[in-house]
């Protein structure tokens, strides 16, 4: 009999979540504008593909960086050999400068307090390994990124206790919600070691208010616990209010750099979302605590960033003309694309939480549910995936307490494909429901009593050929 470890067989990876199941269905039948026009359109992937042309243009003008040359001389052998686990100094300096630039240079970062990791997934898990032991807990506000169930729990043995937030105040964190989560952990005999937040929020697509950040700092200071701020979407805040880093609020409070709260606030960053480079696997841990930095550096040996990647990105991020233009253009394009999605949803009678950041919208489909239950939410989600052929993420996969919310991504697909997705959704809503267009605000609707016919025919009809020639053909 084949014997595997408990970690290998324990069902805490989250692969049975509807979030991952939607991906599996997409991979079986992926949409292609020529070869599979009736396939599933991927709107469950938080990738930023809107500014690749800016990076490709820079690479074309700076061939030495990609060719591993410096002053005309090859440095391939130098990069191919073992490097210090601390990372290339030039890259760490470029990285902290870019982090500061995204935050409007309101805060600065010390490269000696930065630990490089193979993506934000590794960074978050490393933080949990550093701060908590198996059987202890972290508090996370809902709704939250479904992957946290895998990233934070699977190998660490740490528990997640949700901080339940609701639509009544736009899913903002409240003192009551924090205290209730802490008390719930105590009832379960779980020692709370920290709070982890994502700012800007995934899946809400909103930035945290200054008051929320002050509240969090007061809470962790009072409880004597840590605060991890996952800020991997910090460069995606495209509308006011602007993004505020937890480090900025620490500075505003004039915290003593030797105080416990100063030492217990940490940041996760990555280039996956802001630069659209998830395949490069570049993440970072930032902490004011020397012991955390030392421990994380040791653990980073299990997930290093290649020296070739560091060299290329060091050259790219050190070009201030590029970074200034990229940040501004990225904001502009994200705002335009988000507006397009919101407009398309409104034509189907569907509204969204008012968002100002991220690569997705938090979409309100409560009025389309058969009943106010998570069973009804899953029923609607299955129709959208299997009949409408759109992969979106149901709120239940994000641990939302209210049925009927969905995360819909907009930056990972061409504009033409987004148009097609909105046509499919509008046809679906018109077929199944009686819903007026939204002109701002939520809408109520009634289930259509007409015969519910298969949507296969109209899905087939909504191909690009029916909407005119493809530009450039």
Curated annotation (Swiss-Prot):
Activity control = Inhibited by L-aminoethoxyvinylglycine (AVG). Inhibited by L-vinylglycine (L-VG). Inhibited by S-methylmethionine through a L-VG ketimine intermediate.
Effect listed in the UniProt record for changing residue 230 to N: Loss of catalytic activity
Q: Which Pfam families match?
A: Aminotran_1_2 (PF00155)
Pathway given for this chain reads: Alkene biosynthesis; ethylene biosynthesis via S-adenosyl-L-methionine; ethylene from S-adenosyl-L-methionine: step 1/2
Give the CDD domains listed for this entry: AAT_like
Binding locations of substrate: 84-85, 145, 151
- Single GO BP term: ethylene biosynthetic process
Per the UniProt record, which EC number(s) apply here? 1.4.-.-, 4.4.1.14
Cross-referenced InterPro entries: Aminotransferase_I/II_large, Ethylene_sulfur-biosynth, NHTrfase_class1_PyrdxlP-BS, PyrdxlP-dep_Trfase, PyrdxlP-dep_Trfase_major, PyrdxlP-dep_Trfase_small
| Catalytic reactions on record | S-adenosyl-L-methionine = 1-aminocyclopropane-1-carboxylate + S-methyl-5'-thioadenosine + H(+); (2S)-2-amino-3-butenoate + H2O = 2-oxobutanoate + NH4(+)
| UniProt GO molecular function | 1-aminocyclopropane-1-carboxylate synthase activity; oxidoreductase activity; pyridoxal phosphate binding; transaminase activity
In the record, N6-(pyridoxal phosphate)lysine modifications are located at 273
- Which domain of life does this protein belong to? Eukaryota
According to its UniProt record, which cofactors does this protein need? pyridoxal 5'-phosphate
Which UniProt keywords are present, listed alphabetically?
A: Ethylene biosynthesis, Fruit ripening, Lyase, Oxidoreductase, Pyridoxal phosphate, S-adenosyl-L-methionine
As for what it does, the entry says: Catalyzes the formation of 1-aminocyclopropane-1-carboxylate, a direct precursor of ethylene in higher plants. Also catalyzes the conversion of L-vinylglycine (L-VG) to alpha-ketobutyrate and ammonia. Can use S-methylmethionine as substrate.
Query: Which family is it part of?
Result: Belongs to the class-I pyridoxal-phosphate-dependent aminotransferase family.
Q: How does it assemble?
A: Homodimer.
In its UniProt entry, what is this protein called? 1-aminocyclopropane-1-carboxylate synthase
UniProt lists the gene as: ACS-1
